[in-house]
Amino acid sequence: MSKKPSAGGKIQWTKMFRKLSPYTIRKGFRYMKHYGPKEFWIRLHERFEPEEVPYGTWYRAYIPTEETLETQRKQKFDYSPLISIAVPAYQTPVEFLRQMIESLIVQTYSNWELCIVNASPDNEEMQKVLAEYSAGDSRVRFCNLKENLGIAENTNRAFAMTKGEFVGLLDHDDLLAPNALYEIVKILQDHPQADALYTDEDKVTTELDEHFQPHLKPDFNLDLLRSNNYICHFFVVRKSIVEKAGGFRKEFDGAQDYDFIFRCTENAGEVLHVPEILYHWRTHKASTADNPASKMYAFEAGKRAIEAHLERTGTKGEVSHTQDLGFYRVKYPVQGKPLVSVIIPNKDEKETLQTCLEMLEKNTGYQNFEIIIVENNSTTDEIFRYYKELSGNRKIHLLRWGKEFNYSAINNFAAAHAKGEYLLFLNNDVKSINPDWLEEMLGVCQRPEVGGVGAKLIYPDNTIQHAGCVIGMGGIAGHMFVDMPADRTGYLHKASLLQDMSAVTAACLLMKKEVFEQTGGFTEELAVAFNDVDLCLKVRKNGYLIVYDPYAKLYHMESKTRGAEDSKEKVRRFQTEIEYMRCHWIDILKKGDPCYNKNLSLTKWNYSLKPIPGMETEAGQKKEKTGRKSCRKYQ
């Protein structure tokens, strides 16, 4: 993959100034004081760079028309479970309370109940509103507590009110999209045994006049969940799982939902993701959506929730905060001292190989490895003299490949000679940044559910070359965050979070040898392109995880010895490999990468929105043509 011109770098000043207020200015100063000027400037760029596809315009084209909603109301499902919505309410502004309730009343799926626990016994306005709605719609029920018992116990009281087969969690000042429950029940038609579901979400201003910051999620992603409560809203779970998990726990107040989601997913069979924006998280001064620092205690509770999850699952790991509030790092310690076989193909490159070997010797903390160099038809005397110099090193083994270049065959050949329990496929043109890179990757790879681990690779100019691969990107597969400054974290900090991916590059790929052999190794029909993607997909098909690890960082020159793919022969070979991937992985190419999202672009590496056909660029035009409303007004 060749480097592309950077798409970012400029701040959208008009947008930034429009957002300014005394409150946002104070918030900015707090951030700069806490993180420093450099980090503040980086985040300012990320927050206010122009959107490739503006979310406001996109959202107006995305939401269902009134005609579509009416069609949904008439839909009769074979399986129509009662869904109970549990809402703990405390000192809720009555306007917010009304809007939340109205967002349920206008649902296109009607078999629901709303169970509200009012923990504000002295708030007469709230009691009047609740009594009014309860009298007008029997599906709206409420209970007045004598005192505020705290968010966890208030929610448990709401759980106790529920009668439905499924229970959904809704904050007292947030909103559901009118098709939220419809989409939940729709996916249950094909997955009636599912135990838990979650949807995508966005944020909405206090006055409901602007939607922003869409959170477009992957399918269930264990390592991402251990890095951040990405599931968050809207979470719906079978009531039997709620009872088994035990409800909310007050010792995790501030991150009680995070702890609850962990326990539910641990007990659940199938966890489904509904890739639609069905929850609107209202921002205001007191909410963590707008001001994370307003609930600093919540982030410590989140750390403890991860630690408790690791303990329950018997997983050894050390949890720490990252520089971004609410995002965490789990460091998995290496168990024992397993042998790692480092496989490095090489042709002619003496200086490049020498730099790589010196890195392994001097800038790699974990030293229990053997090095297998696969000599591939070199022609220079210099490289053979260097091989002779290496012959005295007992860690290094030289294999000779006499056939034509075939990356897959070369690595399979080396793997057959490897003595290690783990195989590290490593390009000769990489150089480590942090000495614990191999230890970091090995700790992750030793987990029983993990098949392979890929590193974060950075160009010499400190821009990203690889931060995981997305299937379908650019046609077959492509790297994410290419050419983004390495000190940026990207969309929802994904460039800097440990997470499961469908594929990672084999320029630095650690894999259990047993798993490699189970999958049949690299597919030799893929001589140059997509062989690593194909291998990762085979590993995932066998039930193992492929993990992107941003804490293992290396510099990478990328295909320095191969040159450009520009000859007729290379182009023809590349087309053949594309056809192989299309034939063998047609299902995932059609359905979409489960570690990505259907509403994200397959032509942009930076998690941009996928344009909706026919969407207008001028605000309001689509609304007039289709009857869509960009921000629904709830009475």
Segments (PLM) and residue ranges:
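Conserved donor NDP-sugar-binding/catalytic core segment of glycosyltransferases
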Residues: N179-F212, V430-I476
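N-proximal low-complexity "stem/linker" segments adjacent to membrane-targeting elements
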Residues: K33-S103, E307-K362
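A short, conserved alpha-helix in the catalytic core of glycosyltransferases
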Residues: I241-K244, E251-I277, I306, W437-M441, ...
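Short, acidic, metal-binding catalytic loop of nucleotide-sugar glycosyltransferases
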Residues: E102-N111, D190, E358-N368
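Short aromatic/hydrophobic "clamp" motif used to bind/position activated sugar donors
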Residues: V167, L423
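Glycine-rich, basic loop-to-helix element that forms the pyrophosphate-binding segment
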Residues: L145-T162, E183, W401-A418
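A recurrent flexible, glycine/aromatic-enriched loop bordering the glycosyltransferase active site
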Residues: A152, A160, E210-S240, S408-A409, ...
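A conserved acidic beta->alpha catalytic loop
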Residues: S110, N118-K128, E147, I373-Y386, ...
